[in-house]
Amino acid sequence: MFNLKLNFMSYDFKYADLLDDDVFKLVFGRESTKDVMIEFLNQVIPDRKIVDLEFIDKEMHPVERDAKGVVYDMFCKTDSGARIIVEVQRRKQPFYPERAIYYSTFQIQRQVEAGADTYDFLPVYVINILNFKMDGNKDRADVKSVYRLYEETTQRLLTDRVTFIFIELPKFKKSIDELDGNVLEGMYFCFKNMAVLEECPKVLTHQIFRKIFEVSELYNMDQDTRDKVIHKMTTERDLRNQMAYARQEAIEEGRAEGRAKGLAEGRAEARRELCMSMLEKGLSRETV
């Protein structure tokens, strides 16, 4: 029987949460784990075969002095020159799609040199791994959504140079018993459940998962990194439990208010029925 811990009050983690910024960088953002990132990107962008990539400085300064700069979670350039930005977002933020668009502009600007005769640039991808459902996209069942620039009526593609990909993890509902060896779905499962797993599920047979689990294991990290990650994981777990408790309290209070309101409405209805009965029997309104 596969062992999946569901007691979120327990802090005896074996594996780190892949949605943690530091852990994501450890697993996907180093030269020693570059093959993990390449496999992930090839799964997410199947129409672009990536053979190699280069990790680049994540901090982007604006062209204008007073404009807002950004720091990407992960930024790399593929062997064909495509720029890929990867963002991991645990909590919902307002204007998140607009943020993704803003992030893409830095890589467009930096490819078009001042004074250039053309505005040609190599493809830019912004991949967003989200631990929430986006507003306006909640009715869509697919975990992965791909957005490009299209003509509204004909749906003709304007350009393939800018692509936005959103992975909404709450939409991935499969249990371990429902996985069939699909690599991308296996990665979705790990993103959602790594922190509560005690072993690598046997269905995850691709060699890449062996490395993901090895690097994510807390006792394979140095002491400082392990302490930092565990502290963040316990804080996140405490916050999640507090939010769950607050929601439960609100539900209970709502039920209590509903019961009280129902009793009051019931009494009022009973009084109305009694008054109508008395009037029907000929009693005056003054008496009633």
Question: How would you describe each model-predicted region?
Answer:
Residues 140-148, 180-187, 231-233:
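Short intrinsically disordered coil segments
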Residues 50, 61-63, 103, 186-187, ...:
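Generic hydrophobic, helix-prone segments enriched in Leu/Val/Ile
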Residues 22, 38-39, 98, 125, ...:
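Active-site-proximal helix/loop capping residues that flank conserved catalytic or ligand/cofactor
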Residues 32-36, 95, 179-182, 207-211, ...:
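Generic recognition of short, well-ordered alpha-helical interface segments
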Residues 160-205:
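Upstream accessory/linker segments immediately N-terminal to the RecA-like ATPase cores of bacterial MutS
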Residues 1-165, 170-175:
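Accessory alpha/beta interaction modules
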Residues 2-13, 84-89, 189-287:
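Short, charged alpha-helical interaction segments and adjacent helix-coil junctions
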Residues 41, 104, 183-191, 216:
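Short amphipathic C-terminal alpha-helix that caps PH/PH-like domains
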